[in-house]
Every structure is written in structure tokens, then in C-alpha cells.
């Protein structure tokens, strides 16, 4: 290629190569999170269900990857912006992508964009993948693989995509603009939606065989730590990339991500030490994730000291939800998707209403701590309530449809559950030479 072909001609505007590279790296980091979650959940599961648990996460990669290209992206971010609830159908199969690529090849930055819009398709696909994968943690050990796949496929298009539009659809979007709720990287869209969906489905499925009588200990603690480490690393792209350019706010989001996750880990270990008398690696890993969850809604809106406070607060709250609420109410959130992501996401959204720096706010409204004005806090709470209501109603409808399609039950039969889903559903074993306890 000659030098003349490398550079844009006079009058043409190139994309910002720094931000383009940054967003490409962030996108790849977020894609790493779903395999990381597979290890995290796989380690927490019982030995006889580890392959099923991990496959539910890996299966989401294929399922969401296809559906996002076909319709998910268009429903979330397509259209002309006239609808506050959903995108449109103008970008089905991502057909406009070719024009963007050709424009970029000619050295033209489409519409004055900082980087090619095509990156957003992949970046948001990775968000959709990790969100759907989080749901599977509540269902471990008893759900039909086909039923789970069918549910999540419909859920992606009917719940996740419209919710993403309502929060991140820009001017006119219902939650992000009309209500004025802030969600930097996915407190409402990712964590509350997935955690609440997990809770709803685990209530519909019922408790695992032996729940309350059998101790469901993590079968592979190093897997849990490995998964947490991959999630932690990927989360820098998750939060940092949500600024959508390489600037000081992206750097702030990354710093806050480290700060909150570290504080969450320390706080969890302290609570665990007081409650049980000993710190654990599973506890450290869970606290790390809880800290990541709580800072997600406000990663680019709060100061580092506030991220520290958020991390310190979230672990006792999530620990209580996991250790006490499940026992009190008797629901079987198997791998604590609701206890960590649902509760942590709600708390993060509320705390953003307290600690948001006015100058960093998308709406111009600052947190109560800075302004003494409760308007942003009210918007945050209202945004959470609306998210919960939408997810609750649509989840129940989708679950009823899928249940009817699968002969009235989303759950495997008792014999298959007792044998283990690895053998009964997949004919595989993670440890074929091991003959000990499950």
C-alpha cells in the first residue's frame, strides 16, 4: 500500500486512533468476562453439575452472539430515537455496517464519530452476553438446558434490549432521559435485570433436591478464584469502556473499579471473620465481585473516596442477603446471582444518587452529598423501581410461555437431578477418574 492510500485527503476527518484502540481493547476485555463467570460459577457448583453450570455460560456466548446480530442490536440501539422504550428494526442483521466500514476505509469519520460505530455493536454484544450468563447462576443444578436457552433467547430480545434502550438510548429514553436516572455501566441494565431474573426463575423452579439438609460446598475453590480474577480484569473494559473514549473519565472509572473491588474484598473478609471466625478464598472472590457490581452504576460519576465507601458498604449488605435472607425466606438462589448482582446493583444505583459529582453527571444533577438536593436520588430510586417492575412482569410472561413449550416444567426430573446434570443432560464428566462424593 502506498503512503498516499494510508492518509485521508485534505478535508476528510479520520477517527481518533487512540479512542478507537481503547474501545477495541475494552471490547475484548468484556468478552473475557463470560468465560470468567463460567469458571466462577463452575467452581461454586457441585462436582456432578460443573459441566452443566459452565456450559450454560458458554452456551450464552453462542446464543447471544447470533441473536444480537440478527435483532438485538437493532432493538436496543436502532431506530430514530422517537420511542422511549425500544430501538427499531432498521439495523436488523447489522446491515448498515458495510457503509460504515466503507466510509472508514475512505478516511471519513461517519457523522463526526470518535471511533467506528461498528465497535459499539461488539462492545454491547459483550454486555448482553455477561448479563444473560449471570442469570444462570440462580438456576444451577436443576434447570433443563433447553428451557434455559429458550428463556434467555426470548429474554434478550424482549427484556434486555428494550431495557438497554430505555436506559442508554439517549435523548427521549424512558429511564435515562425522562426519569433522569444515571447508570454509567449497567447497574439497572445488567445487574438488577439479571439478578432479579435469577430470583424469579429460582422461585419458579423450586429448591434443589436436599436443600436445607445437604451442604452445598464449592467443589473447586481455585476455579472460583480464577473466575473472579478474569471478571476483575474484564471489568476494567466494562466500566472504563462505558465512557466510550479514552479520556480522564475513563481513567476515573477504571480507578474507581479497582478501589471499590479492593474495598469490597476487604470488607467481605472482615465480615466473614466476625461471623464465622475465619476468612476464605471464596469470600474474598465474592467480595471482589460485589465491589465491582456496586461501583458499576457510578464508576464514572463518583470520586475514588466514594468508590471506597461503596465497596466497604456493599459486602456486609450482600453477605446478609446471601447468608440470612435465603434462609429466612427459603428461596434457592443457587450461586447467589440475586444476592450479589441484584442486591449490589440496587445498592450501587442508590449510592450513585448520593455521591455523584454534579460536573460529571450526564443530566447535570449531582448527588445529595454534594448538592443537598434529593432530585437525583429520587430519580435513581424511581429508575430502579421501573426496572424491577418491567423485568418482573416480562419475566413472568416469558417463563410461562417457555414452561408451556417444555411440557409444563422448566426443571429436570428427580432422577436426572440426583444423578447430576453433567451425566444426565450432557453425558460428560469433569472428573471421570474421580469416584468420591459429588
Question: Language-model features: where?
Answer:
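Glycine- and aromatic-enriched membrane alpha-helices
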Residues: 9-438
Amino acid at each position: 500500500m502506498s503512503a498516499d492510500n494510508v492518509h485521508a485527503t485534505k478535508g476528510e476527518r479520520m477517527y481518533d486512533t487512540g479512542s478507537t484502540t481503547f474501545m477495541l481493547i475494552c471490547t475484548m476485555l468484556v468478552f473475557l468476562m463470560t468465560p470468567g463467570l463460567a469458571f466462577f460459577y463452575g467452581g461454586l457448583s457441585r462436582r456432578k453439575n460443573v459441566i452443566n453450570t459452565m456450559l450454560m455460560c458458554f452456551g450464552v456466548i453462542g446464543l447471544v452472539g447470533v441473536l444480537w446480530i440478527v435483532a438485538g442490536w437493532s432493538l436496543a440501539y436502532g431506530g430514530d430515537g422517537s420511542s422511549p422504550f425500544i430501538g427499531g428494526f432498521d439495523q436488523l442483521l447489522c446491515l448498515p455496517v458495510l457503509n460504515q466500514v466503507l466510509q472508514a476505509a475512505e478516511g471519513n469519520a461517519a457523522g463526526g464519530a470518535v471511533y467506528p460505530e461498528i465497535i459499539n455493536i461488539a462492545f454491547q454484544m459483550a454486555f448482553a452476553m455477561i448479563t444473560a450468563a449471570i442469570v444462570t447462576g440462580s438456576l444451577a443444578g436443576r434447570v433443563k438446558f433447553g428451557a434455559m436457552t429458550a428463556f434467555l433467547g426470548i429474554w434478550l430480545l424482549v427484556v434486555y434490549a428494550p431495557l438497554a434502550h430505555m436506559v442508554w438510548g439517549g435523548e427521549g429514553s424512558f429511564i435515562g432521559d425522562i426519569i433522569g436516572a444515571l447508570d454509567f455501566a449497567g447497574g439497572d441494565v445488567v445487574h438488577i435485570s439479571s439478578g432479579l431474573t435469577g430470583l424469579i426463575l429460582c422461585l419458579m423452579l423450586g429448591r434443589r433436591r436436599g436443600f436445607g439438609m445437604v451442604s452445598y460446598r464449592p467443589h473447586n475453590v481455585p476455579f472460583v478464584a480464577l473466575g473472579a480474577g478474569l471478571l476483575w480484569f474484564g471489568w476494567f473494559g466494562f466500566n472504563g469502556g462505558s465512557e466510550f473514549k479514552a479520556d480522564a473519565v475513563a481513567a476515573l472509572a477504571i480507578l474507581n473499579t479497582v478501589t471499590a473491588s479492593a474495598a469490597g474484598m476487604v470488607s467481605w473478609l472482615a465480615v466473614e471473620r466476625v461471623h464465622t471466625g475465619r476468612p476464605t478464598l471464596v469470600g474474598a472472590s465474592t467480595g471482589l465481585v460485589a465491589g465491582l457490581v456496586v461501583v458499576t452504576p457510578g464508576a464514572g460519576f463518583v470520586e475514588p473516596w466514594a468508590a471506597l465507601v461503596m465497596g466497604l458498604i456493599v459486602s456486609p449488605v450482600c453477605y446478609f442477603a446471601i447468608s440470612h435472607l435465603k434462609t429466612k425466606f427459603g428461596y434457592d438462589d443457587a450461586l447467589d446471582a440475586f444476592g450479589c448482582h441484584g442486591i449490589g446493583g440496587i445498592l450501587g444505583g442508590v449510592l450513585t444518587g448520593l455521591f455523584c459529582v454534579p460536573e460529571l453527571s450526564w443530566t447535570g444533577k449531582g448527588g445529595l452529598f454534594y448538592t443537598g438536593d434529593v432530585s437525583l436520588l429520587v430519580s435513581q430510586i424511581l429508575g430502579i423501581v421501573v426496572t424491577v417492575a418491567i423485568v418482573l412482569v416480562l419475566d413472568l410472561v416469558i417463563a410461562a410461555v417457555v414452561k408451556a413449550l417444555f411440557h409444563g416444567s422448566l426443571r429436570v426430573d428427580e432422577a436426572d437431578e440426583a444423578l447430576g446434570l453433567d451425566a444426565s443432560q450432557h453425558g460428560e464428566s469433569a472428573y471421570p477418574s474421580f469416584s468420591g462424593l459429588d
